[in-house]
Amino acid sequence: MSDAPHKTLHQILDPDGWKPARGYANGVAASGRTLYLGGTIGWNGQQEFESDDFIAQTRQCLQNIVDVLAVGGAGPEHLVRLTWYITDRDEYLARLKEMGAVYREVIGNHYPAMAMVQVMALMESRAKVEIEATAVLP
């Protein structure tokens, strides 16, 4: 295992000889109190969409995660896993730079283990992104 270039409260798992992951971790080892967040979409606390824009929904979705973490006494630095579900791979790829900026704005320079999955649709018809999160407090 080698140390990844980003700082984290948990141990980043990168096998020797592997090219470092960019924007995520290959694996994370953590122990402590675990918080499991259900699928979070890009609507506000009143369950209303303020935008149909992919980036705006992503920002709101990430902020929703931060808000739920705070209730559990955690912050973005405690995240160990994010699973993203998106409805449009092409839009994601075309707007990757904006996605990165929004991620860093809300979450910071913390990159847990992540997976990104394209789905045909999400349960809320206006939703373009949904994220499940797991966090561990030491």
Language-model region placement:
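N-terminal presequence-like segments and the immediate start of the first folded domain
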Residues: M1-V80, I86-P138
